[in-house]
Amino acid sequence: MDRYFFLQDATTVARLLLGNLLIRKINKKEIVARIVETEAYMGIADSACHSYGGKRTNRTNAMYSIGGYSYVYMIYGMHYMFNVVTADKNNPQAVLIRSIEPISPLLGKKSALTNGPGKLTKFLNIDLTFNKVDLIGNNELFLQRDLNLDFNIVCSKRININYAQEDDINKLWRFYIKDNKFVSRR
């Protein structure tokens, strides 16, 4: 995937990432997983987004990078969330990767290990050291196109954003592969 792919808005990239591969190398071993669920966060106008209203802090600074960088943060003092920054620099949009399907044969196929954003980061050993990493050309964590993209996409409301304004709560900016058993919630 090239930089241009990530310069599109978060809702577009969130859909296009489905079915593609997230690859993590640990100790020279490659863990390959298919992205099966995403959520789009559309920046300063989206009250569910960390950059809502132009908010810029040490935590959210990665969102202001050019598309193709990672945005990793911790919630509840224990779970890391992995996001892909989209759009132009200083247009802070991101896609939360909510669930993945392990592809590497040695990993097994236990959905309970990767069917949520905190679970997948634990599974892939993603922590704050991966915040603000350029995912293009990185050799430890990167995205790759997959040619097997024959599936239906379900659009639904995002999860756990009760703090947002009602119109943002009701936007169908969560996307997942229909009938995939690794999706966190249906």
From Swiss-Prot:
UniProt keyword list: DNA damage, DNA repair, Hydrolase
InterPro entries recorded: Formyl_transferase-like_C_sf (IPR011034), MPG (IPR003180), MPG_sf (IPR036995)
EC number(s) reported in the record: 3.2.2.-
UniProt key word ATP-binding: no
Pfam families tied to this protein: Pur_DNA_glyco
UniProt xrefs under HAMAP family: 3MGH
PANTHER family: DNA-3-METHYLADENINE GLYCOSYLASE
Family listed: Belongs to the DNA glycosylase MPG family.
SUPFAM superfamilies per record: FMT C-terminal domain-like
UniProt protein name: Putative 3-methyladenine DNA glycosylase
Transmembrane segments: none
Organism in which the protein naturally occurs: Borrelia garinii subsp. bavariensis (strain ATCC BAA-2496 / DSM 23469 / PBi) (Borreliella bavariensis)
Source domain of life: Bacteria
The keyword DNA repair is annotated on this UniProt entry: yes
GO terms (BP aspect): base-excision repair
Taxonomic lineage of the native organism: Bacteria, Pseudomonadati, Spirochaetota, Spirochaetia, Spirochaetales
One MF annotation (Gene Ontology) recorded for this entry: alkylbase DNA N-glycosylase activity
